[in-house]
Amino acid sequence: MSLEQDNIDYYRDRFTNHLDSFQEPFRKWMKRRPLRRDLVHLLGSKDAVRVLDIGCGPITTLGCYSPDIDMQLEAVDIRADAYNDLLDEFGFQIPVRPIQGAAEDLVRLFGSESFDLVHCRNSLDHTANAMASLRAMVDVTKPGGFVYIEVYEREGRANKYGGIHQWDIYISDDGILTLGGKSMAPHVPLLACVEDGVRLYHIMNYLSVPTLDADCRKRAVRGKRNYYFDSEDGQDVVTARTIRFVIRKNG
């Protein structure tokens, strides 16, 4: 089975087993769900903004509106056509559907300097070319705008560089946000992948509780570096070290 088919089957199973959760109440909730407060803060006092969610899966959960800002949310995913077929199959009507496209092709899809905020969660390190993808994210961001990225630390190494997990993003021992991969030597500072004209606005490294499949949980038990296996109230809890960073485009 291909990775893409496996991914589609995963969502088909979720939709089948949680069908009621994705019907009218969910659609109404999505329509009125506000953009997260920390992202609204990045947008400042602008009256109207355009926001892009990259690698969103079949349903972007970013938040479709802000009470104080005229907000246009768009979403893109490399499997969007298959996801939209799946949404049609189940009859889901959602406020924002993803369009088909790879992160490396953002400029062709949307044009340069098109968005006030670009959001990318758990997908930069899943791209075919993380360096080109990051450059494209910056290119489609307006001067003065922000690129918000969230990844699990060293996903490539934790997954033995299998399938889509070809890249490692991590903070080096000397505190530098770094990009690497199995066949990439030496590893490089992540912002070196981008032309001049940007700066690291914010960075945070913390533990989170991801949704892990059985294989990931087994790796966690075996003590892979970026997964931690703990016991809480008698229940096993897996946490992952997450890196969240924001790049500001000068302007």
Regions found by a protein language model. Give the residues of each.
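A short SAM/SAH-binding and catalytic strip from SAM-dependent methyltransferases
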Residues: 116-129
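Class I SAM-dependent methyltransferase Rossmann-like catalytic core
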Residues: 1-44
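Conserved class I S-adenosyl-L-methionine
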Residues: 148-177
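Class I SAM-dependent methyltransferase SAM/SAH-binding core
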Residues: 52-106
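A short glycine-rich, Lys/Arg-flanked "PGG" loop and its adjoining helix->strand segment in the class I
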Residues: 131-146
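C-terminal lobe and adjacent flexible extensions of AdoMet/dcAdoMet transferase-like proteins
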Residues: 227-251
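Short alpha-helix
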Residues: 168-208, 212
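A short acidic, Gly/Pro-enriched loop at the edge of an enzyme's catalytic core
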Residues: 104-118
